[in-house]
UniProtKB/Swiss-Prot annotation:
SUPFAM superfamilies: YgfY-like (SSF109910). It comes from the Bacteria. Pathway: Antibiotic biosynthesis; prodigiosin biosynthesis. It is found in: Cytoplasm. This is FAD assembly factor SdhE. Changing R15A: Partially restores aerobic growth of deletion on succinate, less growth in LB, slightly decreased SDH activity, protein expressed at low levels. Wild-type flavinylation of SdhA in vivo, protein still interacts with SdhA. Changing D21A: No change from wild-type. GO terms for cellular component: cytoplasm. Monomer. Makes weak or transient interactions with SdhA. Interacts with YgfX. Interacts with FrdA. Disruption phenotype: Pleiotropic effects. Under aerobic conditions no growth on succinate, 90% reduction of succinate dehydrogenase (SDH) activity, no incorporation of FAD into SDH, however the SHD enzyme complex forms stably, more SdhA is incorporated into the membrane. Decreased aerobic growth rate in rich medium (LB). Partial growth defect during anaerobic growth on glycerol fumarate medium; greatly decreased incorporation of FAD into FRD. During aerobic growth 50% decreased synthesis of prodigiosin antibiotic, decreased transcription of flavoprotein desaturase PigA. Changing E19A: Does not restore aerobic growth of deletion on succinate, less growth in LB, does not restore SDH activity. Greatly reduced flavinylation of SdhA in vivo; protein has wild-type secondary structure and still interacts with SdhA. An FAD assembly protein, which accelerates covalent attachment of the cofactor into other proteins. Plays an essential role in the assembly of succinate dehydrogenase (SDH, respiratory complex II), an enzyme complex that is a component of both the tricarboxylic acid cycle and the electron transport chain, and which couples the oxidation of succinate to fumarate with the reduction of ubiquinone (coenzyme Q) to ubiquinol. Required for flavinylation (covalent attachment of FAD) of the flavoprotein subunit SdhA of SDH.
């Protein structure tokens, strides 16, 4: 997936679990454009992971072994925490 194809990335952010939507969508909407190209690629790679893995990582029930994905999970958690609750 191309890092500049925002409609496709937006679609990929839509998950089958509301908990993931609440974590991933606000990050995409508020922070994606500020990411470096490397972080955008890592975000896209993260979106290609299975929902159960994403859920566990974002809820601190484990972490990815891949350092780029680990960094992205941490970045999503930090930015979402700093932003505060987001209504969906």
């Amino acid at each position: 997936m191309d890092i500049d194809n925002k409609p496709r990335i937006h679609w990929a952010c839509r998950r089958g679990m509301r908990e993931l939507d609440i974590s991933i969508m606000p990050f995409f909407e508020h922070d994606y454009d500020t990411l470096s190209d490397d972080d955008k690629r890592n975000f896209i790679r993260l979106l290609q992971c299975d929902d159960p893995d994403l859920f566990n990582w974002l809820m601190n029930h484990g972490e990815p072994t891949d350092q780029g994905l680990k960094h992205m999970v941490s970045l999503i958690q930090t930015r979402n925490k700093n932003r505060g609750p987001v209504a969906m």
